[in-house]
Regions:
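Eukaryotic intrinsically disordered, low-complexity regulatory linkers and tails enriched in Ser/Thr/Pro
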Residues: 1, 16, 26-27, 123-125
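Phosphoinositide-binding peripheral membrane targeting modules
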Residues: 2, 38-76
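Alpha-helical transmembrane spans
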Residues: 1-6, 10-13, 19-22
């Protein structure tokens, strides 16, 4: 079992296609820009666990840090898509309906930078 995190942070680039003598979009994204997708990978097949819009992200907390903002005591643990224990993983807190949810995951620095781009309102703790 593995996990994949994808952040759609920019529009697909256009490339020149000589067949049409025009610039075309090489690929279409399955999600709008500003979306994060968390997937579980089993036998090379991905199952979507959660899809987040950048505007719904409330906080991204480093290992050992906790979200302490409004309604912090009512955060619901939704998923652990990390190969590490929850205490050693990053967490992302997001709004879903009227509730706050949390996912534990292990991003790299590049991923975190893209999250900062799509969710400038999010608290990084």
């Amino acid at each position: 079992i593995g996990f994949r995190y994808t952040v759609f942070y920019k529009e697909p680039e256009t490339v020149y296609d000589p067949r049409f003598d025009d610039m075309i979009t090489h690929e279409d994204y399955p999600y709008p820009v500003g979306t994060i997708v968390f997937e579980r990978i089993v036998s090379a097949k991905g199952t979507t666990i959660e899809t987040l819009c950048g505007g719904d992200i409330v906080a991204v907390c480093a290992p050992g840090s906790e979200y302490s903002g409004e309604n912090a005591s009512s955060v619901i643990d939704s998923a652990n898509v990390s190969c590490k224990k929850a205490e050693k993983a990053y967490s992302i807190v997001y709004k879903k309906g009227d509730a706050l949810h949390r996912i534990f995951f292990n991003p790299d620095e590049e991923f975190l930078n893209h999250v900062r781009e799509i969710a400038p309102q999010a608290e990084f703790c």
